[in-house]
Amino acid sequence: MPKLITAAERLILAREFIQKARDYPLPIDGGKYDFSYIAQVKDLLRQARDMVKYLPHSAGAGTIIKSDALRILQEADLADKEILH
C-alpha cells in the first residue's frame, strides 16, 4: 500500500517540482524549442499541479493550506509561461 502524503508534504513536493522545472537544463540543440525539453518541463509542472489540485476543495485542509495550494497552482502556470514562452 502506498504511503499517504500529508497536505504540507504535498505543498513542499509541488514547490520542488516547480523548482526542478525552472532548473532543468536547456539543450544545446534547439534550445527551449526542443520537444524533449518541452515535454520534461511540462511533465514536472503537471506533477506539481497534481500534488495540490484537490487541496483547495478538501474539507480537511485549513484555510492556510488551501490558499498555499491555490498559490502553487498559479505559480505553476506562471512558471510555464516564463520557461516555455
Residue ranges and their predicted role:
Residues 1-85:
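Long, charged/polar, soluble alpha-helical segments
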